[in-house]
């Protein structure tokens, strides 16, 4: 464990990607294969393989108490350490220095065993006892990184893609082979073992091991979107939960964008998905659905996180699964095939009698109108259209919004499915009102009827490895949501300043705003004008929030639009 902590320090000390990869590769070569496999997990910010359902379920408040107990530090000293470092792992190093053991006796195998024990028990008290046992044996630098591993906030400027590069470098393998194997097995540790034994080619796709989702890049206008592709498929952008459905003859599992198993939250989808009678992996969206129309996302949120969904809840918030892509079929992974071919294969899975959302007019243009759905017909093929001009895209965009959907997805018909990556092969055209996915970093007590309730949220975008505050919002959520969030934030407070609390950066929210402005008030250098919360993004993790670069893009685009309007105005004035 000591050498891994030292390696993490070395990685954090350089900003050069090539140096980070070289440091990791050298470290991996110095370890046994089992040790190296465990290390790749931890270096990727995980305690268990991506495909595993196990999690530690340890909040910052538990770690705060444990570190305080071991160090003997007062609440004031703990708070000062956290304020100074802005990171619980670094604060741990500060308060345990001179208190923790000087000699290292902790092995990676023992760390892995303790993580398994922590995941297996329930309740803060039981988890705290195990964490005390683990950290009590660690040196201060080791404790720093153990805390970071537990929180999943490593923050050393290392991505899993760079760990893949290090594996390729350490064992002399082709990077493309390493990446493909990791995508297939869903376990960076197992990928290392295959690379070490020159068996990457034996990696096989396994059902019920979720893959990363292909993500879209925002487009600012129909003109921009249309200019990207000569030939594209156009679909509605749904306001639901992105979900990957794995189906065999006797089993169905549904995974969220964060690769969590959410099958139990949607039991009525299981028989409908089983009826497909093919071994497949589908990509799609779960929608709250009634009377042939998608309901607001706030309705769908009522279903999230429930292990036992009552019949009454199923009636109140009925759901359907709208599928728009095929990743695996007939024992083969099809992600490398062009979208047009995958779409044709997906069409073939849906027999003539199966429910469909596409009504084709005499000109062969999909109308994008929704069909009525019976309770037994909960799996639907997403409608697709083609657009021959930006004006046609605008028409389809307006029609999608009339149906209560967010906007449009525009997809290159020749594109492969880029697992876990965002690119310009898929574009998303959303509402004209600008939006960002941000993470809550601090909360404040409200006023008036919300006095005493943590209802004002400060939020951040990601700038490299840092979270940079960019705004504050207090409107948009229901009273019920605010009450639930108040409870969560109190349980996950890192630093309590009285009126304001710094909280674990875990809650992702989608905020809308009118403009991005330059500002010295926030660390990002920007502020959002008239921000309001659209929804809580339970389906997204903190690593998926928007970046500072994205905020800068919106700012520049506003500037260019203003410049064009001014130019048009000047031209009109001169002509008159």
UniProtKB/Swiss-Prot annotation:
Its EC number is 6.5.1.1. The active site is at residue 237. GO terms for biological process: cell division; DNA biosynthetic process; DNA recombination; DNA repair; DNA replication. It comes from the Bacteria. It holds the Pfam family DNA_ligase_A_C. Its cofactor is Mg(2+). ATP binds at residues 235, 242, 257, 285, 324, 422, 428. GO terms for molecular function: ATP binding; DNA binding; DNA ligase (ATP) activity; metal ion binding. Keywords: ATP-binding, Cell cycle, Cell division, DNA damage, DNA recombination, DNA repair, DNA replication, Ligase, Magnesium, Metal-binding, Nucleotide-binding. It catalyses: ATP + (deoxyribonucleotide)n-3'-hydroxyl + 5'-phospho-(deoxyribonucleotide)m = (deoxyribonucleotide)n+m + AMP + diphosphate. DNA ligase that seals nicks in double-stranded DNA during DNA replication, DNA recombination and DNA repair. Belongs to the ATP-dependent DNA ligase family. NCBIfam families: dnl1 (TIGR00574). This is Probable DNA ligase. The lineage of its organism: Bacteria, Pseudomonadati, Acidobacteriota, Terriglobia, Terriglobales. The gene is lig.
């Amino acid at each position: 464990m000591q050498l891994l902590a030292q390696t993490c320090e070395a990685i954090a000390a350089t900003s050069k990607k090539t140096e980070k990869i070289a440091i990791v590769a050298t470290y991996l070569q110095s370890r046994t294969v089992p040790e190296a496999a465990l290390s790749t997990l931890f270096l990727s910010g995980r305690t268990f393989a991506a495909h595993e359902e196990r999690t530690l379920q340890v909040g910052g408040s538990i770690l705060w108490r444990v570190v305080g107990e071991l160090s003997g530090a007062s609440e004031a000293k703990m708070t000062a350490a956290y304020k100074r470092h802005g990171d619980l792992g670094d604060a741990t190093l500060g308060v345990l220095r001179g208190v923790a053991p000087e000699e290292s006796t902790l092995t990676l195998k023992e760390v892995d065993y303790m993580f398994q024990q922590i995941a297996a028990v329930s309740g803060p008290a039981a988890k705290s006892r195990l964490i005390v046992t683990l950290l009590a044996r660690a040196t201060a630098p080791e404790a720093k990184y153990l805390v970071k591993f537990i929180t999943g906030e490593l923050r050393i400027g290392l991505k899993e893609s760079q760990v893949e590069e290090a594996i390729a470098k350490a064992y002399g393998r082709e990077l493309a082979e390493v990446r493909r194997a990791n995508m297939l097995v869903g376990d960076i540790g197992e990928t290392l073992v295959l690379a070490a034994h020159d068996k990457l080619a034996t990696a096989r796709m396994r059902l019920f091991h979720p893959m990363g989702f292909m993500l879209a890049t925002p487009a600012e206008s129909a003109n921009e979107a249309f200019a990207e592709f000569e030939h594209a498929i156009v679909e509605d952008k749904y306001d639901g939960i992105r979900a990957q459905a794995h189906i065999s003859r006797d089993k169905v599992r549904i995974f969220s964008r964060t690769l969590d198993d959410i099958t139990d939250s949607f039991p009525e989808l299981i028989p409908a998905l089983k009826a497909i009678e093919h071994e497949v992996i589908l990509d799609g969206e779960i929608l709250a659905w009634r009377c042939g129309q998608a309901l607001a996302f706030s309705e769908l949120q009522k279903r999230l996180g429930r292990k036992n969904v009552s019949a009454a809840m199923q009636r109140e918030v009925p759901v359907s699964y709208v599928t728009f892509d095929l990743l695996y079929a007939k024992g083969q992974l099809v992600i490398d095939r062009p979208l047009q071919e995958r779409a044709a294969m997906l069409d073939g899975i849906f027999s003539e009698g199966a429910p469909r959302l596409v009504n084709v007019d005499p000109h062969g243009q999909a109308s994008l109108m929704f069909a009525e759905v019976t309770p037994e017909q909960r799996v639907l093929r997403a409608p697709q259209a083609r657009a021959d001009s930006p004006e046609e895209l605008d028409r389809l965009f307006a029609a999608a919004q009339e149906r209560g959907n967010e906007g449009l997805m525009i997809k290159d018909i020749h594109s492969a499915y880029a697992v876990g990556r965002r690119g310009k092969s898929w574009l998303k055209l959303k509402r004209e009102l600008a939006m960002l996915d941000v993470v809550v970093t601090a909360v404040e007590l409200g006023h008036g009827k919300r006095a005493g309730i943590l209802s004002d949220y400060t939020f951040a975008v990601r700038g490299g490895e840092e979270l940079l505050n960019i705004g504050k919002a207090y409107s948009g959520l229901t009273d019920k949501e605010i009450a639930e969030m108040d409870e969560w934030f109190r349980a996950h407070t890192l630093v309590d300043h009285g009126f304001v609390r710094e909280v674990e950066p875990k809650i992702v929210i989608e905020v809308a705003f009118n403009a991005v402005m330059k500002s010295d008030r926030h660390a990002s250098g920007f502020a959002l004008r008239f921000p309001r919360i659209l929804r809580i993004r339970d389906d997204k993790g903190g690593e998926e929030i928007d970046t500072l670069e994205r905020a800068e893009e919106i700012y520049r685009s506003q500037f260019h639009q203003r410049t064009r309007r001014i130019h048009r105005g000047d031209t009109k004035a001169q002509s008159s």
